[in-house]
Amino acid sequence: MSPQTETKASVGFKAGVKEYKLTYYTPEYETKDTDILAAFRVTPQPGVPPEEAGAAVAAESSTGTWTTVWTDGLTSLDRYKGRCYHIEPVPGEETQFIAYVAYPLDLFEEGSVTNMFTSIVGNVFGFKALAALRLEDLRIPPAYTKTFQGPPHGIQVERDKLNKYGRPLLGCTIKPKLGLSAKNYGRAVYECLRGGLDFTKDDENVNSQPFMRWRDRFLFCAEAIYKSQAETGEIKGHYLNATAGTCEEMIKRAVFARELGVPIVMHDYLTGGFTANTSLSHYCRDNGLLLHIHRAMHAVIDRQKNHGMHFRVLAKALRLSGGDHVHAGTVVGKLEGDRESTLGFVDLLRDDYIEKDRSRGIFFTQDWVSLPGVLPVASGGIHVWHMPALTEIFGDDSVLQFGGGTLGHPWGNAPGAVANRVALEACVQARNEGRDLAVEGNEIIREACKWSPELAAACEVWKEIRFNFPTVDTLDDQA
């Protein structure tokens, strides 16, 4: 480090560069109940001690900068600085460490996920002293949680609105995701809902393109919802994607959905941004709309094990910002998702109090102090043969969201929906009778095929489909 140069001697100020660990590495610190706690996976550059790397993360994500500044004397750094209070090695990784950082609550604006992330992950990830950096988990204290509204409605209120209990909800993403006219799109929605699904869904990149403007889509989908409700006697919904280029346009689309009387709208919360998402969530609560959240772009942030941000952090942020559903992987489908890790952040979405459990990737005990829960959505490459595993893994409080697994049925969309509904009802009944879905799942589906030709045809089509690829983002071995 450069030698310090003494200036402004009369006020005790020493200019120059000093090691971060002298100020920001404080292993003696006892965390407070009001601190936001972060667990970072740190990969220092060669020659950088882990204590210096952890302290650098704490400094650059709170009050520090690369050199001493005389305005440090105008505030109380001990009150406002982040502190690296513990460092532990990652089992099996010689160059990686978990650095635990505590942030005073006063560093963050109330009710703002945007400000929280701007502080904690906004700048430090490009720091040259680090080869890589990943935010593995956050502990959000009750004092901060209470400044957020959270999900517009939550799990129980949604079930009451829909009058659906005792089973997972069923959905389908309309395919092809792009290119259909609004009228043909509405037809597909109607066929799926009439066949037995609870929801259909806009794909994440369906906004308002030349082939299908948003207002036309909303109108034809509303017609499909009302027609299918009249024919089935069940409440139906379609996730109308309100995501737009501006917040004002997004709210305009949500207002139109409310005027049509539909039950739910949708938002792409990462590409749309947390400020937009929180605004839409507040509107949905005030106006009785459910809010479905898609996580488009998440894998850019969370897939690599040594750099970025784990999805459990994005899931916690979504629960604060607000959403009634969020896509959470499938474990068994075509998209990335380790089973234990997925179960960990599914609990973080749904439950009120979650104990620390490193075997599931949960670094901190999290108390949501009665903030409403979020329904996890299993979506991506799933079909009827996956139904027993999905029911066993996710339980009743979930949405099982098919796409090609409904619309790819050889007899059409409505028979595809029938096959999904029959498979789900068979699995729920078998589970309620005490059968083990993990062991007897295939047999349960085969038995149901005997009285559902639609399910039998679906099983024949997808009997050979597998997505057997190793998971990239796996949990660490626990020593």
From Swiss-Prot:
GO terms for molecular function: magnesium ion binding; monooxygenase activity; ribulose-bisphosphate carboxylase activity. One of its GO terms (biological process) is reductive pentose-phosphate cycle. The record marks K334 as: Transition state stabilizer. It catalyses: 2 (2R)-3-phosphoglycerate + 2 H(+) = D-ribulose 1,5-bisphosphate + CO2 + H2O; D-ribulose 1,5-bisphosphate + O2 = 2-phosphoglycolate + (2R)-3-phosphoglycerate + 2 H(+). Binds 1 Mg(2+) ion per subunit. It is found in: Plastid, Chloroplast. The modification Phosphoserine is found at S208. The modification N6-carboxylysine is found at K201. Substrate binds at N123, T173, K177, R295, H327, S379. Residues 1-2 form a propeptide. The modification Phosphothreonine is found at T330. InterPro entries: RuBisCO (IPR033966), RuBisCo_large_chain_AS (IPR020878), RuBisCO_lsu_C (IPR000685), RuBisCO_lsu_C_sf (IPR036376), RuBisCO_lsu_fd_N (IPR017443), RuBisCO_lsu_N_sf (IPR036422), RuBisCO_lsuI (IPR020888). SUPFAM superfamilies: RuBisCo, C-terminal domain, RuBisCO, large subunit, small (N-terminal) domain. The basic functional RuBisCO is composed of a large chain homodimer in a 'head-to-tail' conformation. In form I RuBisCO this homodimer is arranged in a barrel-like tetramer with the small subunits forming a tetrameric 'cap' on each end of the 'barrel'. Heterohexadecamer of 8 large chains and 8 small chains; disulfide-linked. The disulfide link is formed within the large subunit homodimers. Belongs to the RuBisCO large chain family. Type I subfamily. This is Ribulose bisphosphate carboxylase large chain. The lineage of its organism: Eukaryota, Viridiplantae, Streptophyta, Embryophyta, Tracheophyta.
